[in-house]
Amino acid sequence: MANIVSNEKTYRHTQKVRKENHAKMSKLRTIVKKTRSSNEQAQLNEAYKVIDTTASKGVIHKNKANRLKSRTAKAFKTNLEVTA
């Protein structure tokens, strides 16, 4: 643990941000998994929203967000064709 007050504050802040980012990533992974096996357009729109929000907050890189949206849409489309 840090001996300097400012370092202690930085440590507390880092831990808080880490927990928040972990929660955002968990939500992202969950919604992507549900969307890939879903056949509802609203679910895909919600996934896009969560992916964009996560990228804008800096949790994931914007290129990763675009790649994730593309792959999710492809899996969604494949699942839609199989169930139809």
UniProtKB/Swiss-Prot annotation:
Q: Which GO terms describe its cellular component?
A: cytosol; small ribosomal subunit
Signal sequence coordinates: none
Q: Which InterPro entries match?
A: Ribosomal_bS20 (IPR002583), Ribosomal_bS20_sf (IPR036510)
Q: Where is this region: Disordered?
A: 1-25
Alphabetized, the UniProt keywords read: Ribonucleoprotein, Ribosomal protein, RNA-binding, rRNA-binding
Which GO molecular function annotations are given, in alphabetical order? small ribosomal subunit rRNA binding; structural constituent of ribosome
Q: Please, one GO biological process term? A: translation
What family is reported? Answer: Belongs to the bacterial ribosomal protein bS20 family.
Instruction: State what this protein does.
Output: Binds directly to 16S ribosomal RNA.
Tell me which PANTHER family the record gives. Answer: 30S RIBOSOMAL PROTEIN S20, SMALL RIBOSOMAL SUBUNIT PROTEIN BS20C
Name of the protein described by the UniProt record: Small ribosomal subunit protein bS20
Native organism is: Ureaplasma parvum serovar 3 (strain ATCC 700970)
Query: Per UniProt, what is the name of the gene that codes for the protein in this document?
Result: rpsT
